[in-house]
Amino acid sequence: MEHEVTKKGLLLDAKGRIMEEGWARKPLWIYQREQVKGGRLRIKEWDYYAVINQQKQYAVTATMSDLGYAALFAISYIDFTRKAVSQKDALTFFPLGKIGLSSSSDMDNEVAWANKTLRFAFVKRGEKRHLMFACPSLVLPDGSIGLDCDFVLNQRKESESLTIATSWKEQRKAFYLNEKVNCMRAEGTIRRGMKSEQLLLGEAWGVLDWGRGRWTYQNTWYWASLSALVENIPFGLNLGYGFSDRTPASENAIYYNHKIDKLGEVQFQFNSGNLMEQWHIQDKEGRLDLIFQPVVDRSSNTNFVVIKSSQHQLFGSYSGTCKLSDGTTLHLDGLLGFAEEVFNRW
């Protein structure tokens, strides 16, 4: 039975176990890294942003993460029209909490990192998330060289987001605290090569995947997301499953006009031998019936024997129907988003 948490409180008890598992419409759990039990290398923390321009048919993503063994910094540019992706990443080893990622997604914070190839700065101030990231040497799908993004994502104070806190049946000291913030209207500029372009009002939307946890060694997950306008109203989806005990909380929800409309279990039906074929996504209550058509696979593979990762983040379009809890049926027609299959041994 899923459990909605409504009061703020500490995430972990003195033994390192979640005090109240469930889901919430706001980030209510107080995360303290020093309270995590089971070794610092098992702690995984990340801020992942994706901004998708529905009108101009492109997406950009930026990641800053502390995975214990290593810190990963990554930038990608997805061109839906050319069906191509450009990406660049960098690793540093044994960051162990030194990057400066925040202990709460709603606190004001600054985190920055740079090397000779990449530079990042994520700044949170009130209702605005200022993202500055660049890769001057990135060769884009159209042949131009260099990507420089300066975006502001607007997260209204009254907007709801989906936060879950769950643990693993086999190891209750292993936990996953995660917030997905959809439908953040994006402003700012993007420079591709020598061409700079201002985002137009309402054409681009951002999503934040804010994750903190103490993980078990091997996991596979599935995640799907989109943020757009449907009949001129902000609409989003966050769907996912695959790891930890989701009895008290799934991370499945419709975002509509900045409010959470909670869903139960969902299932992704796809050809594991060819992820570029259509995916069929449904829920058990009959509220979702979606076709996801991938157009490009942002894939990466890492194998250091002890640490192994295989990631397929597919960008494409969603079509189908979503039924709100009040009975209203919304029709989606080619809205851009993504779905992913990720395996990690870390």
Language-model regions, residue ranges each:
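Structured soluble/peripheral alpha/beta segments that form catalytic or ligand/cofactor-binding pockets
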Residues: M1-W346
